[in-house]
């Protein structure tokens, strides 16, 4: 991985006997050796591969943003910037009941001609190691794979387009733990681009375009499949859905209007590009539902052919069950009888 490290520093956050957060600040950056470069490269790789990221931008009165500007313009050194940030994080952590100890990692680096600032509170795990004398010894390590209190700022995007609503990304916390909320408070940032909402708007625009173009059932299915294939391809490649590029993959309406022109004229609030959402995409080609002890999943093309839904009686009828399911049903019926 091509990565150039500028600065990296660690600060320790611990809990005392009174369950209060204490901080141990480091007074100098780490040496840029193979160990630190390896750590930052792994942080970058793991963070980039994680799903469920949110997008944000700094609030107008963000103190953190002000410090970052001071650092980037040379008015403040990296150690001072990181120390002030760590102290602010300590204050924010104290407000939340789920506050956890950990190691605050702040790293400034460049990857693929883009400057980044990584900020993460990494959990420390206890383990055992074998010494050179073949003795067992306790050891601690940073659990990079399980990090979830993390944000990354695209410094290049932030400095060239401060009006962007997506230069700051963060990992959304697990349900019931408002991790992302507290980390946004720490950075004094507000939620920006909503990727899930963008995907939902795109799916609705696809359905509306099909209806407006008066496509028959088979043509609609083919159109949805083309949209799915493009979006899934972008997802697999790690690229974003580009609406104009997608329109180039799709046939235009009878009057010559392409999908991009349709979304623009109809006022769909779609960004030029955004990350694909697997759950939203799946609805283009499948019907999926679960509840009441049932889980149902079938290709949308089967609706009206082998699977029929009666809205008045809320009844789903399946003609021709899968062989393995049929075998299970017959075995159970024979056993019960």
From Swiss-Prot:
Q: Is GTP-binding there in the keyword field?
A: no
Q: Which UniProt keywords apply?
A: Cytoplasm
Recorded hits in Pfam families, A to Z, give:
NA37 (PF04245)
Cellular component terms (Gene Ontology): bacterial nucleoid; cytoplasm
A GO term, aspect molecular function: single-stranded RNA binding
Q: Using the chain's own numbering, where are the disulfide bonds? A: none
Q: Is Nuclease set as a keyword in this record?
A: no
Indicate where this protein resides in the cell.
Cytoplasm, Nucleoid
| InterPro entries the UniProt entry points to | Nucleoid_associated_NdpA
Checking PANTHER family in the record gives: NUCLEOID-ASSOCIATED PROTEIN YEJK, PTHR38772
Protein family per UniProt: Belongs to the YejK family.
Name of this protein: Nucleoid-associated protein PBPRA2585
